[in-house]
Amino acid sequence: MARGQARAAERQANNGLGKEIEKKLWAAADKLRGSMDAAEYKHVVLGLIFLKYISDAFEARREQLLAEADEGADPEDPDEYRSENVFWVPPEARWSHLLGSAKLPSIGKTVDAAMDAIERENESLRDVLPKGYSRPSLPAVQLGRLVDEVSNIGLHEERHRKLDLLGRVYEYFLGQFASAEGKKGGEFYTPASVVRVLVEMLAPYRGRVYDPCCGSGGMFVQSERFVEEHSHRIGDPARRGQPGDISIFGQESNRTTWNLARMNLALRGIDANLGRQNADTFHNDLHRDLKADYILANPPFNISDWGGERLRDDWRWQFGAPPVGNANYA
C-alpha cells in the first residue's frame, strides 16, 4: 500500500512539474502572438525546442566521451555520437552559442545558420528544420526572450527524460497551436486522448503500423509508448520478430506537417518510413506494396474536393467505390 501511494505521489509531482514547464514555455511563446499568427509561430517555437533538445543530448554525450578520452574516445568524431543515436551538432549550432547571441539584433540570423548547419551535418534532417527566424515579422527582442526561456529547461536532464518532457512539451504545443488555429489545426493534430484510445484498442505489439494521413506523427509516438509500457523498445534488434518489434510507415500530404512529423519522430529516436516526400495518399500512394498489420488513422473528414472522380477504377476499392463528393468512405 505504502509503495503504491509513493508511486502515485511521484506521478503527481512529475505531472505538476511537467505542467509547470509547459505553461512557462507557452507563456513565452504567446508573447509572439501579436507579431504573427499561430500557424507561423508554431514553427518558431517547435524549432527552438528541437534545437535545444539535440544540443543538450549532444553535450551529454560529449561529456561522456571526454571522460573516456584516455580509453580512445574522440569527442570530435561525429560517428561517436551517431552510434548512440545522438545528432552531431557543429559549434555554430550549439545552444551555448545561441544563448550567447540572444541579446543581439542578429539572433534571427544566428538561429537560421544553426538550422542550416544541423541539416548539413545530419542527412536525416535535410530540408526538415524550420527557417525564417530573421524575418521582419519576428522581432529580435522577443525571439531572444524566447531563447532565454527555453534555456532555463534542461531538456536532456535525467528527471526530464523520465517525464518524457520533450514529448510532453511538443504534444502540448501542438495541441495549443491546433486550438489557436481552429479547424485548420485539426489537419496536423489529433488530441492525445483520441490517439491513446485508438492505439490501445489495436494493441500493436508486433508488425507493421501504417498511418496514411499521419499529421505530426502522434499515432506513431503513442504506438512507441504502448510498446515501451509493455517493457519493449521499438527498433531493438534483439527482439526482431518478437513482441515489441514494430515497424512504422506513414504518409502526409502537407509538406510543413510532414516535416513536423519527421522532427517529432527524430527527437524520440523512432525509425520510420514516411516516404521520400510529402504526398497525397489518394493520388500518390508511396507505400503501394506495403502489407500493414495495423492501420491507425484520423482522416480528414467531410472533404468534398478530393479528386474522387479520377479514382473511380482504383484497385483499392475492393468493397465498392466511395462517393465522389465525400471522402469519408475512401
Residue ranges and their predicted role:
Residues 315-330:
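Glycine-rich S-adenosyl-L-methionine
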Residues 26, 88, 95, 258, ...:
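A residue-identity detector for tryptophan
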Residues 1-206, 273-286:
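Non-catalytic, mostly N-terminal accessory regions of nucleic-acid modification and defense proteins
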Residues 29, 91, 98, 261, ...:
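Enriched - but not universal
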Residues 180, 243-244, 317-318:
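A short, mixed-charge helix-start or loop-turn motif at secondary-structure junctions
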Residues 184-297, 302-313:
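Conserved S-adenosyl-L-methionine
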